[in-house]
From Swiss-Prot:
Belongs to the RNA polymerase beta' chain family. It comes from Thermosipho melanesiensis (strain DSM 12029 / CIP 104789 / BI429). The RNAP catalytic core consists of 2 alpha, 1 beta, 1 beta' and 1 omega subunit. When a sigma factor is associated with the core the holoenzyme is formed, which can initiate transcription. Zn(2+) 1 binds at residues 63, 65, 78, 81. Signal peptide: none annotated. This is DNA-directed RNA polymerase subunit beta'. The keyword Transmembrane helix does not apply. DNA-dependent RNA polymerase catalyzes the transcription of DNA into RNA using the four ribonucleoside triphosphates as substrates. Coiled coil: none annotated. GO terms for biological process: DNA-templated transcription. GO terms for molecular function: DNA binding; DNA-directed RNA polymerase activity; magnesium ion binding; zinc ion binding. Gene3D superfamilies: 1.10.132.30, 1.10.150.390, 1.10.1790.20, 1.10.40.90, 2.40.40.20, 2.40.50.100, RNA polymerase II, clamp domain (4.10.860.120), RNA polymerase Rpb1, domain 3 (1.10.274.100).
């Protein structure tokens, strides 16, 4: 006995930010190496990404080294290899981690939009990224050079930048001068003149050396001077022409000083006297001056006193020119005491004049190529450079070079620098005040080093993730919250600042609520997912294919290890920073590749898939694996038609069935012999595998009553998956019943279908009783049959029940065959006496009727009361018959009828021998005449145009109209002509509805008519030929546009429709029937839906069908509850309206008077049933009651008490009724009341004033609607009304949201994609239709494709329509109070109302589309909902698609379900938050209830211990503590808390329980209703799981994690994701706990017995 009780295992799923400790707690070990698998052994590397020690063994129950093998060692850790012996399944579960050497920012929190880290820290996102990625800042700053360091540590000549200088200058005393930086100096230095070089050196004011190279070009006058002369001048002196350089000089003779020998040296011009050998004298040498000659011969002996030389006079040397004196190189002089110079060796003295001189300053470090005194020629190089590139100079220094080297270099006084930036993480309070900096400010590293120089350790800054981590650790969230809240009070609610603060406040509150520490957003350790989720697979050729994740992990590990190494090696800061940045980037790529910077790609340039990519999108974890799973016990095959099957059967190929039911067959074979041994199992398996007969016998048994599910993709609605009872067939194709093709949208041109086997008894029961195809005949979209005969069946039935053309002319008495019974007629037919279509007389139910045998045959299968012996059954008639049968007899009889129709239809379609040939397309003789007439009219129009009576636009419109009329006439003539022969096969097909339509027939045998060009504009040349005659070349060419457009359209449509369906399902999936009755008194007024252009979109009866009444319906005549005379049904509240009721109520109206007088007898008064007003006035208690006052019980009581006996009143019976006619005033053309208007007292008085006596009205009908349902979750049965698929009230648990989405989305592919042009030039608005229009409405687009229309905001009349000179139109509307409202009509749209027309609020005054959001803002929710309903419905109705209103209403309800918080009062929500309407109502109710207990709470809280400290803002705006944690609450503390506006105190009870007491009344939430587009509504759902699985997965998850969001699994998707039964249908708790017991053995034994 198996009892299956089902309880929800998971009640909620929470998502949070993981702390580093949590990440490490998940892990089974640290991954230290980037290696994966050893290339030789193919075993995982130790400590690598696939390490067995961390992740578990690769072989089941076997350690890595093989020491322990087998399950008996389970749990043992091998001491050799360290691997724990367990199942290899562990490799899917066990995680590792990587300890990061440097912290890294989690890219989700940085790059969410808007960035969470940025909002929380109050740092701009760009700046924040810059800090994290060690970025820089481009700064243009001035250069300054220290000229006087004074007492500072600066060196003279050192460089400072403006930013540093400003910081130093505040505290230090030193002098600077603006500087410049030298750019592109010309090198080398080349002399521009020939001349002599002079070199000198000097120091600048910054103590730097300049070498001066002077080159001079000189003119010289040479004056020879001789030894012995005395110079009057010295080198460099200036002399004038005629000055004496040397004065005239008398030279005396030389006499011998002693006896000796004379030696004369002519070369050196000397004379020497050597003494005698006996003498003690030393030799004496005389230098002979110029002009002195010896008078004694050489080597002669002389006596003391002998004359040796002659005496002479040396002439004076006179300067021949003025100039500077320069001594020649060979001149040797000796200074004398009187300042003159004696010439020692003869030489030249020059008088020089400088012709040209150049100075070349060279900065220190330049290499000089010349020496002092060198003679150089022009163009010779002096030095390698005069300045270095990027040399910095003070302005004074710059001027020197600027003067000597003009235009040979450029200088910049400002320099652009890329400065690394840092963020301040710590700052002393005093320093903060002094510098104006605070924690979180971003400065450049230059500024930082300046501050560090000045303040030492009182300021700290850092960059990269570690800096952000420090900032986050510094945050005191409680304090921050208080600060933001106090600031919010000071700024305007709508300002941008307020929005920023609110976003920040939300994050702070979320972090507090989820108890998340902000620094957890910075990763210290990274989890490594289990290896089997990122496998490596060996491909042929011995290579390995690996998952992208492994590559990404490898990059992280490599960079992390390299960073460690670099750090240990004490590498330079810049290298370490770069490595840290690379590590950050590697982790970013791992988490979300491509979000920051360029994506990491593989060899082929494909971006690698990161962890985020594994979650998001169609191929992500959510949509691919959690919401879409693969199914076991399934198969697929091609389908073929199975005409012999019953509607609930399908043919299953034997092979396929055997494979699907193999386990069942095996179990049955084993059960038969009660064997369980292994050999028995093997044997029985062999029986199955060898396909022995007994296997098939068992299969036949098992399959009986075991339904299978068939599904055809695309699964657009629930009818695409139905249950059938399988029949075993030969062959390989599944046989499908032809009548279930429409719901599956299947045909037999190669379609495939999938089969699924429901396994458990509960699943089989559901399949059998809910999903069997015979219970799915009626479509849940519109409540009409969908499993319908078509094509050949319709043709067969039509052929069976049709008659010849003379049938009606034959009189009864002239009919040859008369039968006493149907059997007799059958006999005659069998023997060939009569044919199917011969008129015969037959006695049926005691009356003789004229019919045909065919009609008798068909009537035989029809339920008795619907038999009609004189009707030809086409498609429509069959549909009506099926629907009537369903309503009267239910679904089983209907299914049987359908099967009978199918059998008859196929049989007689075969017998009919229907064929088609080209000659069957008769061409009407009228055709030619109609075309000729049209041509004649066209030439008249052309003539008028030529004469200028018509504009081109008018001519075009007329032409189109003429041809359109002609085409229509040809169509009618053709059909009529073909129909003259009822047996014409083409006519049979078209008239029966089997195939083809009048339009196609027109093209084949009439004329093709007008075509559209690619833009959608109609081409004015029609195609006059038809396909039977053949088209001309031009005609064929014109017609290609449409064909091509059609093909392109279809392809586009499919994907758009699919996406629309997906969004609709997403927005509505959680709408389930949760309760039978929400008890609401509200509802919507039933009305005829008319679109803005006045076309009826939906009749009243269709609006009412399937609804439940919210209020009693009163008969306008009698004011009693309305009763249906046909069935006696009373229309009271909670009555469900079926088809017949809807027809009755939709067409019921009566004429009643507008007003009448009435007397109320005050002695025994009764309140009138209708609205009444006083005619006579009276005074009571000093108050005057005038005529026109509404009469109620209060007035009657006062009138009685005032002494009156009778009260005359005017009764208005029409008030509160709905007009079904338009009443126009006789005086002017003003409409007094319009069709479908609810008549109010003012309207009634206006009618009375215009002497209207009576009006045709219907009762006001208020029906329940999902739009007004007040169920907390989902909707209730009564507001939803009828379940359209079975015409009973909907059951609790039905997933009506999904059904609604499918009903709307499924016909999406039938809608057109086109934007039609209203003919002519594009000035008139294009009308958006079909799918784009539906999407525009569901997505509540702000930008519309067509111009925006104008609507009225009041009820009134069009007083006037005025056009000014510029062509702008204005519409003036007079409301019922007589006020005038003016509306400007934009030039792009036309006025769509007329003067005197009555206008209701929300009604269009012009063409163009109206924005639903505008209606919501200016009018109300009901009008908006009705507008959306009308417009969306119109899109589908135009395309001939019938969908019940309630499906649209569910989507509209979801779009309008959210409210926007304007003022959150004292809740934790923020302005701008979107919440569910019912939730807000509940919260507000709760707040108001709790406010009552404030006084009691204040008493209770005294004496309790504070669990959290109390902080508030004091008078100065400072955040202060009122009471610390852990103290006892006293009266004084309570008083302070109340004064500070603290509304709640959290305390500990005596038993340590933590309780929150409210001590001040709280404000409820103020909100406004919002209209959300479906995509937004999907994302704005309560649960994060379903939002994350829809779109923007990373964003949703990021926000949810910060919030610590809890998903209570209320919707369907959430439960599918966690793998539970969905809370709908039998998965609801109320059904889920029903016990289902399966007793297979018992049943078996009974069978045997």
């Amino acid at each position: 006995m198996m009892g299956s009780t089902f309880k929800r295992k998971i009640s909620k799923v929470t998502v949070k930010v993981a702390s580093p400790e949590v990440i490490r707690s998940w892990s089974s070990g640290e991954v230290k190496k980037p290696e994966t698998i050893n290339y030789r052994t193919f075993k995982p590397e130790k400590d690598g990404l696939f390490c067995e020690k961390i992740f578990g063994p690769t072989k089941d129950y076997e350690c890595a080294c093989g020491k322990y093998k087998g399950k008996k060692y389970e749990g043992t850790v091998c001491e050799r290899c360290g691997v724990r012996v367990e199942s290899k399944e562990a490799r899917r579960k066990r995680m590792g981690h990587i300890d990061l050497f440097a912290p890294v920012v989690h890219v989700w929190y940085l790059k969410s939009s808007p960035s969470i880290l940025s909002s929380l820290l109050g740092i701009q996102a760009k700046e924040l990224e810059n800090v994290i990625y060690y970025g820089g800042k481009r700064i243009i700053e001035k250069i300054l050079i220290v000229t006087n360091p004074k007492d500072t540590d600066f060196i003279k000549g050192s460089l400072l930048y403006q930013t540093e200088y400003e910081i130093y200058n505040q505290k230090l005393d030193f002098e600077v001068m603006p500087g410049v930086i030298i750019k592109s100096p010309v090198a080398p230095v080349i002399s521009s003149i020939s001349g002599e070089v002079k070199i000198r050196h000097e120091k600048t004011h910054t103590d730097r050396e300049i070498t001066w190279v002077d080159v001079r070009k000189i003119s010289r006058a040479e004056h020879r001077v001789y030894n012995g002369m005395v110079l009057n001048v010295k080198n460099g002196d200036y002399v004038n022409q005629g000055d004496e350089i040397v004065s005239e000089m008398q030279i005396d003779p030389i006499y011998a000083p002693f006896d000796g020998t004379v030696e004369i040296d002519e070369i050196s011009n000397t004379i020497t006297i050597k003494p005698l050998t006996t003498s003690k004298d030393m030799p004496v040498t005389f230098s002979l001056p110029y002009g002195v000659k010896p008078v004694v011969p050489n080597n002669s002996k002389v006596k003391k006193g002998d004359q040796l030389t002659n005496g002479t006079v040396l002439p004076a040397v006179i300067a021949s020119v003025s100039g500077n004196i320069s001594f020649g190189k060979e001149l040797n002089v000796r200074p004398l005491e009187d300042g003159k110079y004696e010439v020692l060796t003869s030489g030249s003295v020059y008088v020089e004049n400088v012709v040209e001189e150049k100075h070349y300053p060279l900065f220190e470090g330049a290499f000089v190529y010349v020496k002092d005194g060198d003679e150089i020629s022009e163009g010779q190089t002096i030095a390698d450079r005069f300045l270095f590139e990027d040399e910095y100079l003070t302005l004074d220094e710059y001027k020197i070079f600027e003067q000597h080297y003009p235009a040979m270099f450029t200088a910049e006084s400002e320099v652009e620098n890329d400065r690394p930036i840092v963020v301040i993480t710590e700052i002393d309070d005093e320093v903060s005040v002094e510098t104006g900096l605070k924690i979180g400010d971003i400065i450049t590293d230059h500024q930082y080093s300046a501050y560090r120089t000045l303040y030492n350790d009182k300021i700290e800054a850092d960059s990269g993730a570690s800096a952000i981590k420090k900032l986050l650790q510094k945050l005191d969230l409680e304090k921050l919250k208080a600060e933001i809240e106090s600031e919010l009070k000071k700024v305007s609610k709508s300002s941008g600042r307020a929005k920023k603060l609110l976003r920040r406040l939300k994050i702070v509150k979320d972090l507090l609520k989820s108890e998340t520490k902000p620094e957890w957003m910075i990763l210290e350790a990274i989890p490594v997912v289990p290896p089997d989720i990122r496998p490596m697979i060996q491909v042929e050729g011995g290579r390995f294919a690996t998952t992208d994740l492994n590559d990404l992990y490898r990059r992280v590990i490599n960079r992390n290890n390299r960073l460690k190494k670099l750090y240990e090696m004490n590498s330079p800061e810049i290298i370490i920073k770069n490595e840290k940045r690379m590590l950050q980037e590697a982790v970013d790529s791992l988490i979300y590749n491509g979000r920051m910077g360029k994506a990491v790609t593989d060899r082929n340039g494909r971006a690698l898939k990161s962890l985020t990519d594994l979650l998001k999108g169609k191929k992500g974890r959510f949509r691919r694996n959690l919401l879409g799973k693969r199914v076991d016990y399934s198969g697929r095959a091609v389908i073929v038609v199975g005409p012999h099957l019953k509607i609930h059967e399908c043919g299953l190929p034997k092979k396929m069935a055997m494979e699907l039911f193999k386990p069942f067959v095996l179990a049955e074979l084993l059960n038969k012999d009660d064997e369980t041994s292994k050999t028995a199992r093997k044997m029985k398996k062999a029986i199955i595998e060898k396909e022995m007969p007994q296997a098939y016998e068992v299969l036949e048994e098992i399959i009986k009553g075991h339904p299978v599910l068939l599904n055809r993709a695309p699964t657009l609605h629930r009818m695409s998956l139905q249950a059938f009872e399988p029949k075993l067939i030969e062959g390989n194709a599944i046989q499908l019943h032809p009548l279930v093709c429409p719901p599956f949208n299947a045909d037999f041109d190669g379609d495939q279908m999938a089969v699924h086997v429901p396994l458990s008894a509960a699943a089989q029961a559901e399949a059998k009783f809910l999903m069997l195809s015979r219970y799915n005949i009626i479509s849940p979209a519109h409540g009409k049959p969908i499993s319908m005969p078509g094509k050949d069946i319709v043709a067969g039935v039509y052929y069976l029940t049709m008659v010849g053309k003379d049938y009606d002319k034959v009189q009864k008495e002239n009919i040859k065959w008369k039968f006493s019974s149907i059997d007799e007629a059958e006999l005659a037919y069998e023997f060939g006496h009569i044919r199917l279509h011969d008129p015969i007389l037959v006695k049926v139910d005691d009356r003789v009727i004229k019919t045909t045998y065919g009609r008798l045959v068909f009537a035989n299968i029809v339920p008795r009361e619907f038999r009609d012996y004189n009707k030809t059954y086409g498609k429509g008639a069959i549909k009506d018959l099926v629907y009537k049968t369903f309503k009267k007899y239910g679904v089983d009889r209907t299914a049987d009828l359908l099967d009978d129709i199918k059998d008859l239809g196929f049989h007689y379609a075969t017998i009919s021998g229907l064929t088609v040939s080209i000659t069957d397309f008769y061409i009407s003789p009228e055709r030619r005449r109609i075309i000729d007439e049209a041509k004649k009219k066209i030439s008249e129009v052309e003539e008028l145009f030529a004469l200028g009576f018509l504009s081109d636009e008018e001519r075009y419109r007329e032409t189109i109209k003429i041809w359109a009329d002609a085409t229509e006439k040809v169509q009618d003539a053709t059909f009529e002509y073909i129909g003259k022969d009822p047996f014409n096969p083409v006519y049979i097909m078209v008239d029966s509805g089997a195939r083809g339509n009048k339009d196609q027939l027109k093209q084949l045998a009439g004329m093709r008519g007008l075509m559209a060009d690619p833009s959608g504009r109609t081409i004015e040349i029609p195609i006059i030929s038809n396909f039977r005659e053949g088209l001309s070349v031009l005609e064929f060419f014109i017609s290609t546009h449409g064909a091509r457009k059609g093909s392109a359209d279809t392809a586009l449509r499919t994907s758009s429709a699919g996406y629309l369906t997906r969004r609709l399902v997403d927005v509505a999936q959680s709408v389930v029937i949760t309760t039978t009755d929400c008890g609401t008194e509200n509802g919507v007024r039933a009305t005829v839906l008319k679109s803005s252009d006045g076309l009826t979109v939906e009749k009243l009866e269709d609006f009412l069908f399937g609804r439940v009444l919210a209020k009693d319906v009163y008969d306008p005549k009698t004011n009693s509850v309305l009763v249906n005379p046909e069935n006696g049904k009373e229309y009271t509240r909670d009555t469900m309206i079926d088809d017949d009721d809807a027809k009755f109520l939709g067409n019921y109206s009566v004429r009643i008077p507008v007003s009448r007088e009435l007397e109320i007898n005050l002695t025994n008064p009764e309140l009138p049933e209708n609205y009444c007003e006083l005619i006579t006035d009276f005074i009571y208690d000093g108050v005057h009651y005038d005529e026109g006052t509404e009469v109620n019980w209060d007035i009657i009581r006062k009138a009685k008490n005032s002494g009156l006996e009778k009260l005359t009143v005017k009764e208005y019976p029409i008030v509160g009724k709905v007009s079904v006619e338009t009443v126009v005033s006789q005086k002017d053309i003003k409409q007094l009341v319009v069709d479908e208007e609810l008549i109010m007292p003012t309207t009634a008085k206006i009618l009375e004033g215009h002497n209207v006596e009576s009006v045709q009205v219907r009762p006001e009908i208020i029906v329940r609607s999902v739009l007004t349902c007040e169920a907390e979750h989902g909707v209730c049965s009564k507001c939803y009304g009828m379940d359209l698929s079975n015409h009973k009230i909907i059951g609790v648990g039905e997933a009506v949201g999904v059904v609604a989405a499918q009903s709307i989305g499924e016909p999406g592919t039938q809608l057109t994609m086109r934007t039609f042009h209203t003919g002519g030039i594009a000035t008139t608005a294009d009308i958006t239709q079909g799918l784009p229009r539906a999407e525009e409405l569901f997505e509540a687009r702000k930008k519309l494709k067509e111009p925006e229309g104008i609507f009225s905001r009041v009820k009134g009349y069009v007083k006037d329509i005025v056009e000014d000179e510029t062509g702008k139109k204005k519409v003036y509307i007079e409301d019922e109070a007589g006020d005038i409202h003016e509306y400007d009509i934009p030039t792009k749209v036309k006025v769509s109302v007329n003067k005197g027309q009555k206008i209701l609020p929300g009604q269009s005054l012009s063409t163009g589309a109206i924005r639903p959001r505008k209606i919501l803002e200016t009018l109300d929710v009901d009008t908006t909902a009705l507008y959306l309903l009308k417009e969306i419905k119109k899109v589908y109705v135009e395309q001939g698609v019938d969908i019940h209103d309630k499906h649209f209403e569910i989507i509209i309800k979801q779009m309008l379900d959210k409210v926007e918080v304007i003022d959150p009062g004292d809740t934790d929500y923020l302005p701008g938050d979107l919440l569910r309407l019912q939730m807000v109502k509940r919260i507000n109710k709760q707040i108001l209830e709790e406010n009552v207990h404030v006084e009691t709470n204040r008493k209770r809280v005294i004496g309790k211990i504070l669990h959290q400290h109390l902080i508030a803002e004091d008078e100065n705006g400072e955040i202060v503590e009122i009471a610390p944690e852990g103290v006892e609450v006293t009266e004084e503390i309570l008083e302070k808390a109340i004064k500070s506006g603290i509304k709640e105190i959290i305390v500990k009870n005596g038993d340590g329980e933590i309780v929150t007491y409210q001590i001040l009344p709280k404000e409820p939430i103020k909100y406004r209703r919002r209209l959300l587009r479906i995509t937004k509504a999907s994302l704005e759902r309560v649960g994060w799981l379903s939002a994350a699985s829809f779109q923007q997965t990373p964003q949703v998850l990021t926000e949810a994690a910060i919030e610590g969001s809890v998903d209570h699994l209320l919707g369907l998707k959430e439960n599918v994701i966690v793998g539970q039964l969905i809370p709908a249908g039998t998965g609801l708790d109320m059904f889920a706990n029903i016990q289902i017991e399966e007793t297979p053995r018992l049943a078996q034994k009974e069978k045997m017995a």
